[in-house]
């Protein structure tokens, strides 16, 4: 639900992160949910499909669960639309642009890419003829559709890139001096305080 609210908030020119922060001031009953690029791992993206399959067999589909899956599955496309919009404002074409993905694991501080939204995001970027590299301290190699994705070793200098997409908020990324980066930054997790970045 929070991903759908993030999309709606952007359309209404409302900062979803300010909304979440305001909700935190409620003295009781608040559970924080944060938008992101989708869901990954071997449980959340997969297990509800079994439930949906079984409930459809008995003629009682779980519509809310299926709608949540649909929205979460659409988030990589939403990320692409947002970065395209940001780049267009700077008169940078997505085609042939150089894009760096920071973090490709499905969650922070692990080296697991199963069902990671980063895979879909990279695939979409490649389909649009962007040149994509990644950096993830927990993952040494990444191959998508038989294409090996270049790993960037130097994360102190992003000047070679047109766009940096923060996908996974690994703790080690806290050491990066994002404030002094002049490259476009899109933070899909809202985990970093970066004055010059756009957040999902």
Predicted regions, residues:
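Structural/interface elements that position substrates and couple domains in central-metabolism enzymes
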Residues: 1-200
């Amino acid at each position: 639900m929070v991903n759908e609210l993030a999309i709606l908030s952007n359309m209404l020119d409302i900062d979803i992160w300010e909304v979440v922060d305001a909700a935190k001031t409620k003295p009781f009953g608040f559970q924080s949910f944060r938008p992101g690029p989708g869901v990954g791992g071997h449980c959340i993206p997969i297990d509800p499909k079994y439930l949906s399959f079984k409930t459809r067999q008995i003629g009682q589909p779980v519509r809310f669960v299926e709608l949540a899956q649909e929205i979460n599955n659409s988030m990589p496309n939403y990320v692409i639309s947002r970065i395209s919009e940001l780049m267009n404002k700077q008169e940078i074409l997505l085609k042939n642009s150089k894009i760096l993905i920071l973090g490709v694991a499905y969650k922070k501080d692990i080296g697991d890419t199963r069902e990671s939204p980063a895979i879909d995001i990279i695939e979409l970027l490649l389909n649009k003829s962007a040149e994509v590299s990644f950096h993830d301290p927990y993952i040494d190699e990444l191959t998508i559709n038989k294409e090996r994705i270049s790993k960037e070793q130097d994360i102190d200098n992003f000047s070679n890139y047109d766009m940096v997409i923060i996908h996974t908020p690994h703790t080690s990324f806290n050491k990066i001096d994002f404030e002094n980066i002049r490259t476009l930054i899109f933070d899909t997790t809202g985990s970093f305080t970066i004055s010059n970045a756009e957040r999902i």
